[in-house]
Amino acid sequence: MMVFLVSFISVEMKSMHCAPLFRQLVFSRSLHYSKTIFHNGRGLTSTSESEMSHFNALASSWWDVNGPQRILHKMNLLRMDFIHDTIRKNLKLNENTDDEVYIPPFSVDLLPQGIKNKIDEDQEMRRDEILNDSSLTVLDVGCGGGILSESMARLSFVSSVKGIDLSADVLEAAKLHKQKDPMLKDKLSYTLNAIEDIPETERFDIVTMFEVLEHVDYPSRVLLEGLKRLESGGWLFLSTINRDFVSWFTTIFMGEHVLRIVPVGTHTLEKYINQSEIKDWLQEDSNRKSEFRVADTKGCVYLPAYGWKFTSCPDVGNYFMAIQRVK
């Protein structure tokens, strides 16, 4: 089954242009609907009753690593890698210091291996120093049962994490699980809030929206509210799903109905958002264009025998995105 799935996806990614009739029948209405919804900034950041009911039903099993949310538990490892790696590689190594590390104006790969290793070692040590002196604040939007929130709160360079969600049942599961680790008591808090309930004057170094935008009614509004709450230089990390055949095949057909590794009804094709649509949305407004930059976008895929892994194609299937507030 796994060989078939990977082979099928590989063929489909190379030959999607060969099925225009299929795409027209399945995706023409979806494309129009999703673009309209994404660009509608007038609605509130709430989600539908059906979405709420679906996630409320999962509350009691949220922390069962072999249960309905096991895919999220596995994805959390990739989330943490993406956040950590993005922050580290974008640190300003020689800011506010007289003891500068050498940053060559060319690729270190051109240097002899010994010199390259020394430069890399010095830079990594400086990154460690900067992070050890950091005290970052985090807002986890759509935190669910707290899988990511707890992981973020355990990072040494994070001082506080606030998780918000619209499901009281799921938040109760998060609060109960938090009590199992006394070290989280003063670093992690949960509140029943939509993001617009958080004062715009309350800013965070990191805002996360993993697997959120495809579950809300007006994703552009949610994304905008998240960006507004970033400190200058802060990061918004998100993950969602491209609206294409591969996504439908892997997440809905295979994931929900064949392999049943995701609860049926978790995903709605029309709510998927192409990564290009988010980038276009950021560029179409002059203020957003000058204030924010997309620093990285990575595709990712779930392989049942392996787990989640990054891919080199963010235009197909699931993807992660890092957006930085530059001023």
UniProtKB/Swiss-Prot annotation:
- Name of protein: Ubiquinone biosynthesis O-methyltransferase, mitochondrial
The coenzyme or cofactor needed here is:
Mg(2+)
Q: Which pathway does this polypeptide act in?
A: Cofactor biosynthesis; ubiquinone biosynthesis
GO MF term list: 3-demethylubiquinol 3-O-methyltransferase activity; 3-demethylubiquinone 3-O-methyltransferase activity; polyprenyldihydroxybenzoate methyltransferase activity
Q: What does this protein do?
A: O-methyltransferase required for two non-consecutive steps during ubiquinone biosynthesis. Catalyzes the 2 O-methylation of 3,4-dihydroxy-5-(all-trans-polyprenyl)benzoic acid into 4-hydroxy-3-methoxy-5-(all-trans-polyprenyl)benzoic acid. Also catalyzes the last step of ubiquinone biosynthesis by mediating methylation of 3-demethylubiquinone into ubiquinone. Also able to mediate the methylation of 3-demethylubiquinol into ubiquinol.
Q: Identify its membrane topology class.
A: Peripheral membrane protein
State the species of origin: Candida albicans
InterPro entries per record: SAM-dependent_MTases_sf, UbiG_MeTrfase
Reaction(s) catalysed by this chain's protein: a 3,4-dihydroxy-5-(all-trans-polyprenyl)benzoate + S-adenosyl-L-methionine = a 4-hydroxy-3-methoxy-5-(all-trans-polyprenyl)benzoate + S-adenosyl-L-homocysteine + H(+); a 3-demethylubiquinone + S-adenosyl-L-methionine = a ubiquinone + S-adenosyl-L-homocysteine; a 3-demethylubiquinol + S-adenosyl-L-methionine = a ubiquinol + S-adenosyl-L-homocysteine + H(+)
Q: Does the keyword Aminoacyl-tRNA synthetase apply?
A: no
